[in-house]
């Protein structure tokens, strides 16, 4: 297997499916050979709408296409499956794949509920089949730089971290994003990126205090969370499914410098007292291509996914649901 590319199949060919498909273009260890979707208009389209202010296009003319998960796994010898279907189906189809012994890479969030996340882990362990969740900020160069700065202490102690992630209200097939019971609203679908980064970099906070409101979906669609760590740092993250274009950003205040990244984060600014601004070029490759590359590399080498273990992404769900409870009750929630 060392010299061959792993063969991947995508389940779900809407916005994220097309996003993932384009991320296979220059992969060294894997290639996309097939896609499956129950919706003909999505399956046969060469582009799909994302909640990033545009459309994602994938070169899909050479891909074999199937109308269901069952058809694809019956006719293809897949080395792994890449799940890009709506959140409330993640667990069901991940478990089906794992029980068949098919290594599984799934879009975030891991699942709609903690019970579903636990069932996914149990299925992976029972079958001895690898499972990884695509929490892409762990692989996004700007956030990798931030975590390295924190871990190394190169700029001194982290004093404050503020993150923001905002987009227009997404739609999806039959407007599924707008059903809070399915998508979890902005908090579980989009804000969970920043929730995961907080957990990945700083560990589980002692408590969260979230100020938020329901808006379009019945779930929490606008929120700001304070993640409470005794002795610091001061950490907050803001999210909104509002009316404007997509944007993401962070400001990290260290003792010796402040880091800032925004937009699609192809560069990062470093501010130091009484010094010129330093700009770090990070390149155009985002987290989706990099997380798939990591998954395939580990899978080929038969190594665990140390940077993104299933239990760690299960804990991200636990943290996000604590934020939801805080927003709904107006009270601090301890973890």
Predicted regions and their residues:
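Hydrophobic residues in well-ordered beta-strands that form the structural core
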Residues: 106, 131-133, 237, 261
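C-terminal helix-rich "cap/oligomerization" subdomain common to oxidoreductases
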Residues: 1-2, 41, 80-82, 118, ...
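Active-site loop of classical SDR/Rossmann-like NAD(P)-dependent oxidoreductases
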Residues: 19, 281-293, 308
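N-terminal Rossmann-like dinucleotide-binding module
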Residues: 1-58
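Beta-loop-alpha module in the N-terminal Rossmann-like domain of NAD(P)-dependent dehydrogenases
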Residues: 20, 57, 61-123
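Contiguous beta-strand/loop segments that form the cofactor/metal-binding neighborhood of enzyme cores
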Residues: 189, 195-267, 292-304, 323
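Predominantly a Rossmann-like dinucleotide-binding segment in NAD(P)-dependent oxidoreductases
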Residues: 16, 130, 137-211, 216, ...
């Amino acid at each position: 297997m060392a010299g061959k590319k792993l063969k991947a199949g995508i389940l779900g060919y809407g916005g994220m499916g097309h996003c993932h498909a384009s991320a296979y273009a220059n992969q060294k260890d894997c290639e996309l050979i097939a896609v499956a979707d129950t919706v003909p208009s999505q399956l046969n389209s060469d582009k799909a709408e994302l909640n990033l202010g545009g459309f994602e296009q994938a070169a899909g003319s050479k891909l074999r296409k199937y109308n269901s998960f069952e058809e694809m796994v019956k006719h293809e010898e897949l080395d792994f499956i890449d799940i890009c279907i709506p959140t409330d189906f993640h667990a069901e189809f991940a478990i089906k794949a794992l029980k068949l012994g098919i290594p599984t890479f799934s879009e975030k969030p891991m699942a709609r509920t903690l019970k579903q996340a636990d069932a996914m882990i149990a299925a992976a362990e029972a079958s001895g089949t690898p499972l990884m969740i695509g929490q892409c900020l762990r692989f996004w160069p700007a956030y990798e730089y931030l975590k390295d700065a924190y871990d190394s202490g190169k700029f001194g102690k982290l004093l404050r971290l503020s993150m923001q992630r905002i987009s227009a209200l997404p739609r999806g097939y039959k407007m599924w994003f707008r059903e809070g019971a399915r998508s979890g609203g902005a908090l579980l679908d989009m804000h969970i990126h920043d929730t995961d980064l907080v957990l990945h970099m700083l560990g589980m906070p002692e408590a969260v205090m979230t100020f938020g409101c329901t808006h379009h979906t019945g779930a929490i669609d606008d929120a700001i969370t304070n993640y409470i760590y005794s002795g610091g740092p001061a950490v907050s993250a803001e999210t909104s499914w509002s009316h404007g274009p997509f944007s993401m950003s962070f400001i990290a205040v260290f003792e010796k410098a402040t880091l800032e990244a925004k937009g699609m984060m192809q560069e990062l600014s470093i501010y130091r007292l009484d010094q010129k601004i330093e700009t770090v070029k990070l390149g155009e490759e985002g987290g989706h291509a990099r997380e798939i590359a990591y998954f395939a590399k580990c899978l080929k080498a038969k190594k665990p996914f140390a940077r993104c273990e299933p239990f760690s992404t299960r804990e991200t769900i636990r943290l996000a649901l604590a934020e939801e409870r805080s927003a709904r009750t107006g009270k601090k929630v301890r973890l």
